[in-house]
Amino acid sequence: MEDFSTRTYGTSGLDNRPLFGETSAKDRIINLVVGSLTSLLILVTLISAFVFPQLPPKPLNIFFAVCISLSSITACILIYWYRQGDLEPKFRNLIYYILFSIIMLCICANLYFHDVGK
């Protein structure tokens, strides 16, 4: 009889991926680093929108802050659903893409707020 440890379940090799709800230590570290970096950059961007270049803030800076906040709320909802197990693991890549887009938006906003390139 075949040994259970050698079954491949239709994949090209041994399949040791975690099941739903299980995450490896590597995945947890990646999630913490990406989440912390994104949260810090969003916080810096929102503060910069209201403080720089002078008080009172420019309306365009407020618009940037609102757009970033709305994008962040969307990402937070997806992360919440993913952690609850309502989304399949393949949606993790979508969450990473959305967070990368938010990071790029924050970088663009900060460059605009601080008049870089003029």
From Swiss-Prot:
Membrane topology: Multi-pass membrane protein
One Pfam family this sequence matches: DUF2678
Cellular localization per UniProt: Membrane
UniProt keyword Ribosomal protein, yes or no: no
One GO cellular component term noted in the UniProt record for this chain: membrane
Record has Protein biosynthesis as a keyword: no
InterPro entries: DUF2678
Range of residues in the leader sequence: none
Chain ranges passing through the membrane: 32-52, 62-82, 94-114
Modified residue annotations for N-acetylmethionine: 1
UniProt keyword annotations, A-Z: Acetylation, Membrane, Transmembrane, Transmembrane helix
Family note: Belongs to the TMEM243 family.
Matches recorded under PANTHER family: TRANSMEMBRANE PROTEIN 243
The protein's name: Transmembrane protein 243
Organism for this UniProt entry: Bos taurus
Lineage: Eukaryota, Metazoa, Chordata, Craniata, Vertebrata
